[in-house]
Swiss-Prot record:
It comes from Gorilla gorilla gorilla. It is found in: Membrane. The keyword DNA damage does not apply. It comes from the Eukaryota. This is Taste receptor type 2 member 38. Signal peptide: none annotated. The gene is TAS2R38. InterPro entries: TAS2R, TAS2R38. It holds the Pfam family TAS2R. GO terms for cellular component: membrane; plasma membrane.
Length: 333
């Protein structure tokens, strides 16, 4: 257990503002990712074949719906149940662990999407790379099942690491600038060890994502040089596909790094320094990142854009019909 001589309190106004922002982020994130899920799932209901990228987007939207739900539960825990003067309760620790696992599955899916973009857009000249790209295109469903299996294995290992590690106490003495002496008694760092384990387990998919994204960037550079020499038309479908894919991957990289840094900072803020305001800021950042990438995916996917246009036209026609009906009812006979 951690005992500090000074504990920062959080006012009711701050907690209410944070909860309002959390509800808003949950609503936006749920709507955007539910939209991606429903558009692709509707094709499954109609028994239309899904492309490989649509299958990945379907799984990605499910994982992000789970992420948003966990972050919203974390916000409720912070504002109503988790006290600064007490150690982390088991429910909040469980939420953090589940978020780490869901975030790791999200990273594996993004790496899978990056590999898929490489196999579809890059023109390989080496025989091995051509066979590898063809294998990725054929085995995308098996890769998705493998991601689910890896997530389950990670869940079991994290639970085992969390509950099997023995309890211990570490006392640390810190001298502040005003010569204030703080005795830190840190007990049961199992959550932090599980957190580090999940981050280490995320290194392989992150490296895979970086390598495939780098290959796509190099391919885009080569394609643009080829266009300058041989092609005069600025509208090239291959170039547009490269740019859209890179926008999606670069935006995911930025959002993932920001979200991971916020998550990593939030753990010592709450365990060591009991800075609930800092944790609230980190949770808000973590909740905003999946919504931002979902918006980028919708803007870069033709099928999703058509669905958005259809919904907007339907809403506009419905409002027009309702307005005409009200105008007719007010007109005297």
């Amino acid at each position: 257990m951690l005992t500090l001589t000074r504990i920062r309190t959080v006012s009711y106004e701050v907690r209410s503002t944070f909860l309002f922002i959390s509800v808003l982020e949950f609503a936006v994130g749920f709507l955007t990712n539910a939209f991606v899920f429903l558009v692709n799932f509707w094709d499954v209901v109609k028994r239309q074949p899904l492309s490989n990228s649509d299958c990945v987007l379907l799984c990605l939207s499910i994982s992000r719906l789970f992420l948003h739900g966990l972050l919203f539960l974390s916000a409720i825990q912070l504002t109503h149940f988790q006290k600064l003067s007490e150690p982390l309760n088991h429910s909040y620790q469980a939420i953090i662990m589940l978020w780490m696992i869901a975030n790791q599955a999200n990273l594996w899916l993004a790496a899978c999407l990056s590999l898929l973009y490489c196999s579809k857009l890059i023109r390989f000249s080496h025989t091995f790379l051509i066979c590898l790209a063809s294998w990725v295109s054929r085995k995308i469903s098996q890769m998705l099942l493998g991601i689910i299996l890896c997530s389950c294995i990670c869940t079991v290992l994290c639970v085992w690491c969390f509950f099997s590690r023995p309890h211990f106490t570490v006392t640390t003495v810190l001298f502040m600038n005003n010569n204030t002496r703080l005795n830190w008694q840190i007990k049961d760092l199992n959550l932090f060890y599980s957190f580090l384990f999940c981050y280490l387990w995320s290194v392989p998919p992150f490296l895979l994502f970086l390598v495939s994204s780098g290959m796509l960037t190099v391919s885009l550079g080569r394609h643009m040089r080829t266009m300058k020499v041989y092609i005069r038309d600025s509208r090239d479908p291959s170039l547009e596909a490269h740019i859209k894919a890179l926008k999606s991957l670069v935006s995911f990289f930025c959002f993932f790094v920001i979200s991971s840094c916020a998550a990593f900072i939030s753990v010592p803020l709450l365990i060591l320094w009991r800075d609930k305001i800092g944790v609230m800021v980190c949770v808000g950042i973590m909740a905003a990142c999946p919504s931002g990438h979902a918006a980028v995916l919708i803007s870069g996917n033709a099928k999703l854009r058509r669905a958005v246009t259809t919904i907007l036209l339907w809403a506009q026609s419905s409002l027009k019909v309702r307005a005409d009906h009200k105008a007719d009812s007010r007109t005297p006979c």
